[in-house]
Amino acid sequence: MSPVFPMLTVLTMFYYICLRRRARTATRGEMMNTHRAIESNSQTSPLNAEVVQYAKEVVDFSSHYGSENSMSYTMWNLAGVPNVFPSSGDFTQTAVFRTYGTWWDQCPSASLPFKRTPPNFQSQDYVELTFEQQVYPTAVHVLETYHPGAVIRILACSANPYSPNPPAEVRWEILWSERPTKVNASQARQFKPCIKQINFPTNLIRLEVNSSLLEYYTELDAVVLHGVKDKPVLSLKTSLIDMNDIEDDAYAEKDGCGMDSLNKKFSSAVLGEGPNNGYFDKLPYELIQLILNHLTLPDLCRLAQTCKLLSQHCCDPLQYIHLNLQPYWAKLDDTSLEFLQSRCTLVQWLNLSWTGNRGFISVAGFSRFLKVCGSELVRLELSCSHFLNETCLEVISEMCPNLQALNLSSCDKLPPQAFNHIAKLCSLKRLVLYRTKVEQTALLSILNFCSELQHLSLGSCVMIEDYDVIASMIGAKCKKLRTLDLWRCKNITENGIAELASGCPLLEELDLGWCPTLQSSTGCFTRLAHQLPNLQKLFLTANRSVCDTDIDELACNCTRLQQLDILGTRMVSPASLRKLLESCKDLSLLDVSFCSQIDNRAVLELNASFPKVFIKKSFTQ
């Protein structure tokens, strides 16, 4: 028998072992409930009284439903005592993230997911909160007032944001984590997970959320940190903990929270001379590469230490064409980038979102990495990467000539002048500037030179003075535009809409939510319906003037419509909605929350007639 066949069996067994271990760690949230419950029974002396405190300040977050110049529906509402709890319902005084469900993943603007994302990393958004006193946490309570169940991970940081001296080391520890689970009730609840004990005091807590299973926007009211000033001593009950639980939990946390000692793994991958590679070298190179494509980045690091042949495969730049480093944000630093550098010379998709904050990545370290690895980059994700400055964007513009997609979402610390460098990226097809400080002059320059743009997000860009001028430039230069996000743009009028509608006939998605200066009486919405027949998603959220005439025009002209949000209008009747639903056979999402003519009875009747459509109607208790 050929030696290749037993070798295939061996390799298959190895692959099975890897998958089995990953499957075990994927259920760690279920396995560790008992473990963490025991840990929470820490013995404290009577003198070590528990401190209970609400969040003092919200210091960072990835998105929110509200405006940058308001308190309604913003993350800043998480600071302080509860505003709403124990009441349930949709209240402006709560913290709300920008998305829910899978609707945004089904839109034309949705990006393809990265390969090799660890199965235990499913966070979509986050918020970081500080507290007055550093304590050893004994409990973290989250007051959820509407559609609970989004929080999937709670972390603590060793750094004290209020200390005048920067710490020598910054550590993040997972206090609790779980896979997304569906909570059937929409009522308020006090979420009290059993948290793990950590060996440092903290006053910086991070919540990570996944809203994919939610029926509507989750609303958070407050976060309560319980803790003690002195380090507690575990009781003897902890001897009941299963050692297998500890091993699996440690493995999962390294994969889920960061590439723990990634540089050590790479540096130790220099192997001595072994007797041979068994029969591995009898297999086709491409077959081994294909199998290794299923491993996560930490798995590759471990496998590289087994033999020289597999080390060669694990370090092959072809394994790093798509590189997602976001799951390892808590550990990724300059040293990690340095060791990855030689392996990433062919990288095309790179995700550094959430990474590098609090000094983990320096401007020099990022620049060195891109100078070696930027030439083939096509897609670069940098959402919430607060280490970025003007020099970084200049390096991107110089080192990434083939870049087609750039995401700077919530990089709100970037200075306005930094955005001028984006205009040099003439091949851009996707640009996300949500919650940035881009100014009008820089944006006009970008639009002038980046005429290949197909997807553009300008949501909550508060530094832009005149959105009509921007809309006019978009209509004149961006003829290939397919999706446009103008969420909460403060001053676009019917003139800007006219320029958009005439200049961008390929538009499939348009978000005009919370744009108060648009009035239906000017005919702007009927113009959109006439000139943009390819529309699949249209958000007119909180526009009080949307009326039956607008809905009728959409029904007649935009039959491909899949998502429509008309929250807050007083002038749309059930009859016009029925006509819309009869004409738009692909409609799957219709938000009629706070539409005064659409009561619960009307929603029930429409649901009965069109059961495939998710009709959303929020409420306030």
Swiss-Prot record:
SMART domains noted in UniProt? LRR_CC
Specify the superkingdom.
Answer: Eukaryota
A Pfam family this protein belongs to?
F-box-like
- InterPro entries from the xrefs? F-box-like_dom_sf, F-box_dom, Leu-rich_rpt_Cys-con_subtyp, LRR_dom_sf
Start-end of each LRR repeat: 376-397, 402-421, 427-448, 452-474, 480-501, 504-524, 532-558, 559-583, 584-609
GO molecular function ontology, one term from the record: ubiquitin-like ligase-substrate adaptor activity
Keyword Oxidoreductase tagged: no
| Occurrences of domain F-box (ranges) | 277-332
Q: In which tissues is it expressed?
A: Expressed in heart, kidney, liver, lung, pancreas, and placenta, but not in skeletal muscle.
Instruction: Describe the protein's quaternary organization and the partners it interacts with.
Output: Part of a SCF (SKP1-CUL1-F-box) protein ligase complex. Interacts with VCP. Interacts with PPTC7; this interaction promotes destruction of BNIP3 and NIX and mitophagy suppression.
Which disorder is recorded? Answer: Mitochondrial DNA depletion syndrome 13: An autosomal recessive disorder characterized by early infantile onset of encephalopathy, hypotonia, lactic acidosis, and severe global developmental delay. Cells derived from patient tissues show defects in mitochondrial oxidative phosphorylation and decreased mtDNA content.
Protein's name according to its UniProt entry: F-box/LRR-repeat protein 4
Q: Which organism is it from?
A: Homo sapiens (Human)
This protein's gene is called FBXL4
